[in-house]
Amino acid sequence: MSIVNISCYKFVTLNDREALKADLGARCLQLGLRGTILLAPEGINVFLAGTRAAIDAIVAGLRADPRFADLEPKLSLSAEAPFTRMRVRLKKEIITMKMPVVRPEEGRAPAVAAATLKRWLDQGCDDEGRPVVMLDTRNDYEVAAGSFENAVDYGIGVFSEFPPQLQRRRDDYAGKTVVSFCTGGIRCEKAAIHMQEIGVERVYQLEGGILKYFEEVGGAHYRGGCFVFDAREAVGADLQPLGGRVHC
């Protein structure tokens, strides 16, 4: 497999989006990359595929900007590029929640690392003895490809449906530790901040999402694959395309 696929995001205030769009678009085309970069006032969201050299070059270029110096892309390999073209797009949000009061660039919710989460799930509680609730913030068609064992999901069709569903179920999480998760971390970060704001007592986001969990600890306590928004459709715990091997 010769194609490297990366995804990463950063919540950070961007006031020069037009200039960034032109610059990143030109660099990606020059490097022969395919994929999508989203730019919004709240930050950047990146999905790219290309040769190892091209990916290394664009990541180095992004990190040269102090705003993106701590970007930590999640990597996987494939035989072919899962994208057909290169696009840099300007958006109102890098992930649409329609909750303007939620401003992740002003501060993150607490995060739990993959190894720590695995330990909690192994022992059936967090380190303080609280029950752990895995809360899937993804859309219903993504959940159908796979999810954590016994995870709660709201059967939503789009992420903007998450806040009202959460509001109705807020009291279900009293006395429990809630871990929000998604594909790569962006939605669970927004979701965790929103949960804190409406008074859910103990909330963590899964650092780096499902893909980082797969990368660091494999598929423990997870069933099926992880839906991805490209031609691969879903990847397994080994981060390889599942094709027809998805089991729900």
UniProtKB/Swiss-Prot annotation:
Gene: trhO
Enzyme class: oxidoreductase
GO biological process, one term: tRNA modification
Name of the molecule in the record: tRNA uridine(34) hydroxylase
Family: Belongs to the TrhO family.
Residue ranges annotated for the Rhodanese domain, each copy included: 128-222
Catalytic activity annotation: uridine(34) in tRNA + AH2 + O2 = 5-hydroxyuridine(34) in tRNA + A + H2O
PROSITE patterns: RHODANESE_3
Pfam families per UniProt: Rhodanese, UPF0176_N
E.C. numbers: 1.14.-.-
Family annotation (PANTHER family): RHODANESE-LIKE DOMAIN-CONTAINING PROTEIN 7-RELATED, THIOSULFATE SULFURTRANSFERASE/RHODANESE-LIKE DOMAIN-CONTAINING PROTEIN 2
Keywords carried by this UniProt record: Oxidoreductase, tRNA processing
Residue ranges the record marks as coiled coil: none
Nucleus in keyword set: no
UniProt GO molecular function: oxidoreductase activity, acting on paired donors, with incorporation or reduction of molecular oxygen
Role: Catalyzes oxygen-dependent 5-hydroxyuridine (ho5U) modification at position 34 in tRNAs.
Active site: 182 (cysteine persulfide intermediate)
